[in-house]
């Protein structure tokens, strides 16, 4: 009988620990702002949607990501603004992204002239629960997006 109690106790504690694990938020590139073209490059705003699948709030402290447009890596971006995401909630994070024509000659300009683009991001974000330790999580996302070109005449 003592072995059965020990087995049940072990099973219950394992189940409780599994329920208490943190599921990482899901980050998806949601929007590419209207490109601001310059002589040596372009600037655009990249907006991400963050979903928290947990029943407690989480904080995203920072994000580092690589951006690929139509299969071409055009650079890396950073988000340093902290974002709190409510339980089962969503939040938005944005980053100003600088594209250098010299880095990927010809490709960037041809991508920027299109209305629609395949956008892929991969990177890592740093998150934590309230009062908890920071945790590093890798992510990747893909989307087919229109550039936000603002109002059309």
For each predicted feature, which ranges?
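Bacterial N-terminal signal peptides that target proteins for export
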Residues: 1-8
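Intrinsically disordered, low-complexity Pro/Gly/Ser/Thr-rich segments with frequent PxxP/GP/PP motifs
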Residues: 69-105
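Terminal connector regions
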Residues: 101-153
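N-terminal Sec signal peptide cleavage junction
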Residues: 18-19
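A short, structured loop/turn motif at beta-sheet edges
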Residues: 53, 85-91, 115, 130
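Intrinsic-disorder/low-complexity, polar/charged segments enriched in Ser/Thr/Lys/Arg/Asp/Glu/Gln
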Residues: 41-45, 90-94, 118-120, 138-140
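Post-signal-peptide N-terminal segment of Sec-exported extracytoplasmic proteins
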Residues: 26-30, 35-76, 127-129, 133-138
């Amino acid at each position: 009988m003592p072995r059965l109690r020990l087995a049940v106790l072990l099973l219950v504690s394992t189940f409780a620990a599994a329920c208490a694990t943190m599921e990482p938020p899901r980050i998806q590139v949601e929007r590419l702002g209207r490109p601001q073209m310059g002589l040596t490059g372009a600037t655009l705003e990249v907006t991400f949607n963050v979903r928290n699948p947990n029943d407690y709030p989480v904080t995203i402290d920072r994000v580092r990501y690589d951006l690929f447009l139509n299969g071409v890596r055009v650079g890396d971006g950073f988000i340093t603004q902290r974002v709190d995401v409510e339980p089962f909630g969503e939040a938005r994070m944005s980053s100003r992204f600088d594209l250098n024509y010299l880095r990927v000659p010809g490709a960037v300009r041809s991508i920027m002239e299109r209305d629609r683009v395949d956008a892929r991001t991969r990177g890592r974000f740093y998150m934590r629960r309230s009062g908890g330790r920071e945790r590093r999580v890798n992510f990747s996302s893909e989307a087919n997006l229109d550039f936000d070109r603002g109002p059309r005449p």
